[in-house]
């Protein structure tokens, strides 16, 4: 970033320290980039961009993946930059609720059509109210009409962790964690960026090699007692920012969704036509009709996330 901006000066070093402190980055500066959580990676990319001291700053959905505190800090920082440094800022936002106070003008893009320029005040006064529900009655009934899989969902203890600790080098990510999920429960896992949420989910999804050294039960079976990773994954539908970053496959969307039936990144077994029908069903549920043959790499990032959501739902998993 310093090379992009020019000379490394004392002033830029002070700016660097200010950004580190503002985003609470000191604790992960020595981590490899590949080990950063989605929120930490977002902070890292924002910091790198800000160190370069650009004249025009274009940010695509900068608040996605940030915890509430960091969202507030980023808004304050951008407000400061726009006023004190005369930085030109263009934000691409999917949600009108994310429009920060310092924005002066808005252009709405809808159905591939670019609207007229409006002041923020005029836009907020005339915008259409947000939909309370985007799932139609017909789609909801179609989901409820799917065949029940109660006989396949017979685990009483879906997840149980007993005094689980995860350590990388000198860094302790989780320590003496106890957590039990019973059949029928629905959990929200909440925490700041870097708190260990992604690491915790990697244990549940059998993606963390340290899980074999931990006391973990998944779907009534203790880890390391003969089950394979695929025996576990067949029960789980999973989507995350980390998965989105790694799933860069130039494949038709319907094959991306179908890979969820095979628990693979990519598709190496030809699905049956009935399985393709399942894929089309979930693409339709998420409003993605007509894109089944389009390349995943040619979709917007938002459309890609919806395709990966359909992939997570397609096998009607015991744990989502």
Regions found by a protein language model. Name each.
Residues 1-35, 241-298:
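ABC-family P-loop ATPase nucleotide-binding domains
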Residues 46, 309:
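Hydrophobic anchor residue at the start of the ABC signature
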Residues 57-61, 320:
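Catalytic Walker B motif of ABC-type/P-loop ATPase nucleotide-binding domains
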Residues 111-142:
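Conserved beta-strand-loop-alpha-helix hinge in the C-terminal portion
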Residues 159, 173-176, 292:
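Conserved structural motif at the start of ABC-family nucleotide-binding domains
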Residues 190-192:
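The feature captures the beta-strand-to-loop junction immediately N-terminal to the Walker
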Residues 215-231:
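ABC ATPase NBD Q-loop/coupling interface
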């Amino acid at each position: 970033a310093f090379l992009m901006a020019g000379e490394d000066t004392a002033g830029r070093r002070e700016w660097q320290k200010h950004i580190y402190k503002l985003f609470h980055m000191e604790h992960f500066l020595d981590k490899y980039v590949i080990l950063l959580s989605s929120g930490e990676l977002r902070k890292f990319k924002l910091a790198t961009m800000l160190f370069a001291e650009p004249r025009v700053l274009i940010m695509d959905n900068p608040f996605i993946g940030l915890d509430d505190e960091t969202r507030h800090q980023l808004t304050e920082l951008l407000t400061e930059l726009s006023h004190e440094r005369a930085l030109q800022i263009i934000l691409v936002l999917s949600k009108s609720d994310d429009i920060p106070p310092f924005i002066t003008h808005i252009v709405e893009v809808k159905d591939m059509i670019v609207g007229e320029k409006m002041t923020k005040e005029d836009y907020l006064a005339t915008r259409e109210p947000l939909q309370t529900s985007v799932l139609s009655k017909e789609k909801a009934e179609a989901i409820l009409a799917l065949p029940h899989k109660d006989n396949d969902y017979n685990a009483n203890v879906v997840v149980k962790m007993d005094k689980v600790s995860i350590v990388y080098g000198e860094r302790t990510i989780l320590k003496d964690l106890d957590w039990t999920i019973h059949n029928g429960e629905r959990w929200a896992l909440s925490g700041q960026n870097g708190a260990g949420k992604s690491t915790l989910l990697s244990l549940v999804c059998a993606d963390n090699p340290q899980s074999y050294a931990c006391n973990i039960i998944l779907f009534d079976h203790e880890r390391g007692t003969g089950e394979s990773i695929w025996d576990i994954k067949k029960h789980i539908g999973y989507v995350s920012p980390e998965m989105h970053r790694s799933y860069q496959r130039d494949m038709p969307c319907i094959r991306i969704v179908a890979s969820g039936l095979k628990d693979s990144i990519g598709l190496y077994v030809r699905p049956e036509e009935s399985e393709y029908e399942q894929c089309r069903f979930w693409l339709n549920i998420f409003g993605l009709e007509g894109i089944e043959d389009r390349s995943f790499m040619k979709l917007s990032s938002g459309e890609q996330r919806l395709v990966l959501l359909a992939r997570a739902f397609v096998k009607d998993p015991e744990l989502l």
